[in-house]
Each structure stands twice: as structure tokens, then as C-alpha cells.
Regions:
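N-terminal localization/anchoring segments of enzymes in phospholipid and broader phosphate metabolism
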Residues: 1-242
């Protein structure tokens, strides 16, 4: 009954029912580790609701959706769907495809060195190495200059790859570092779900990067962990970068 009353899809619960029936001891252990909704209830209490967009932004988005509907009707349903869920549509934005991690990371580092107002980074993996060493110097220098620097990274994605000493160095110069869903807080449950797999960088609200590239040497093929690494991303310049 406990599993049945848990929030979630019935198909998800059915898998747990079958596992508990076939192997009760193993099923109970696995449910205790990964199956419950305790973390689902815990995380919302520690997150803040994203502020609503100003009305002017919403109005510009509606105008952009109307324009898109007329010019590219096939995309109108997608645009309207996103807007209904508070994802606004922006115009006046150029998009550059970056086919390799080395290209994206080089581009990101060069743009970060020119930041004047802020640098925001959110990544699943921030791994110490040549890429990080170069980026860290820029982030610390910019923080000393008064540029707002904020970093969010996933704790599980950085186990043994991003040290406490590095975090201390960043915080000493004014960089705000937030660790998403720290693993040590859930060691009794070993929750490996609810990770932050985003790879987003935003610089001054004018330039943004996203895609499949984390900040780690293997993504630039400086080191080889799993063979030649092929991942890509995009650079947005303009209103959409905000």
C-alpha cells in the first residue's frame, strides 16, 4: 500500500511490485535506497520559484509567437506550448553551432575573459584539469574586478573530480558556489536520481552556451577516458541569451 500511495506513474510502481514479489529482501533494500519519494518532497523545500518574467517580456514573446505562426506555421504549436509554461520566445538572436567540445570550451573561455557584468555557470561536471585551470584563473580575476560570478554544479557528477580546496579558492575571491543535491546529505539513502545534468553558461546576458559539453578535459580530448569524445553545443548571442 505504501508504494501504491506514492506519487508517480502506475507503470513505475508496477516494476517495484514485481521486484518485491520476486525477491522481497532485495526489493526492499532497493526501494529503501532509490524508490521512495522522500527526496522528491525534500528538494522543493530547498528550491526557490523562478521569478515571473516582466510583462514587457511576455508581450514581446506573444508578438514573436504571432510572427512565427505566420511565417512558420509548423512551429506554432511548439512555440505556444512553451509560452504557456512560461518559456518565452525571443527574437534578434543568432545561434552558432559548435561541433566539438574543444571549440565550445575555447569559445567559452575567450568570452568569459571579456565579461563585464556577470558569469553564470551551471554544469553536471566541473573537473579539475587544463580546461578548468585556465577557466578558474579567469573566474577569479573577474570576481576580483567586481564581476558577479556564480557557479552551480552537481555533486554526484563531480565526485573526486572537484576538490573542496578549489571551492574554497573560488569563495575566497567572491565567487558564489552552490552544490546541487549534495551526495553526503543522502548517504543513508544513496539517492543517485534527481541530478542536475544541465550544461549552461551565460555571460553578461548577451552570450550563452548550452549543449552536451561539460567543463572537463575529456570533452576537449585533452585526455582520453572513453575513446575519442564527440559532443557539441550552441552559442546564442542576443536577446535569447538572457
Amino acid at each position: 500500500m505504501h508504494i501504491y500511495n506514492e506519487p508517480g506513474e502506475l507503470s513505475y510502481k508496477l516494476i517495484w511490485f514485481i521486484l518485491l514479489l520476486l525477491a522481497p529482501p532485495v526489493g526492499m533494500i532497493l526501494w529503501f535506497l532509490w524508490g521512495g519519494a522522500a527526496q522528491k518532497r525534500h528538494l522543493p523545500r530547498n528550491t526557490k520559484r523562478f521569478p515571473d518574467e516582466p510583462e514587457s517580456v511576455r508581450m514581446r514573446s506573444e508578438i514573436a509567437v504571432d510572427k512565427l505562426t505566420r511565417q512558420l506555421p509548423a512551429w506554432s504549436r511548439t512555440a505556444n506550448y512553451l509560452c504557456r509554461r512560461d518559456f518565452q520566445l525571443y527574437q534578434n538572436t543568432s545561434v552558432t553551432y559548435l561541433p566539438e567540445g574543444a571549440i565550445l570550451l575555447r569559445n567559452l573561455i575567450d568570452r568569459a575573459a571579456k565579461a563585464e557584468r556577470f558569469i553564470f555557470l551551471e554544469y553536471f561536471i566541473l573537473a579539475e584539469g587544463k580546461i578548468w585551470d585556465e577557466l578558474e584563473k579567469i573566474l577569479c580575476a573577474k570576481a576580483r574586478e567586481g564581476v558577479e560570478v556564480k557557479i552551480i554544479f552537481d555533486d554526484f557528477g563531480n565526485i573526486k573530480r572537484f576538490s573542496g580546496e578549489t571551492i574554497d579558492r573560488l569563495r575566497e575571491v567572491g565567487v558564489e558556489v552552490f552544490i546541487f543535491n549534495p551526495v553526503h546529505e543522502y548517504v543513508n539513502r544513496l539517492h543517485f536520481n534527481y541530478r542536475d545534468h544541465r550544461k549552461i553558461a551565460c555571460i553578461d546576458g548577451d552570450v550563452a552556451y548550452t549543449g552536451g559539453v561539460n567543463i572537463a578535459d575529456e570533452y576537449a580530448n585533452i585526455i582520453e577516458r572513453f575513446g575519442y569524445w564527440k559532443d557539441s553545443g550552441v552559442c546564442l548571442e542576443g536577446e535569447g541569451a538572457w
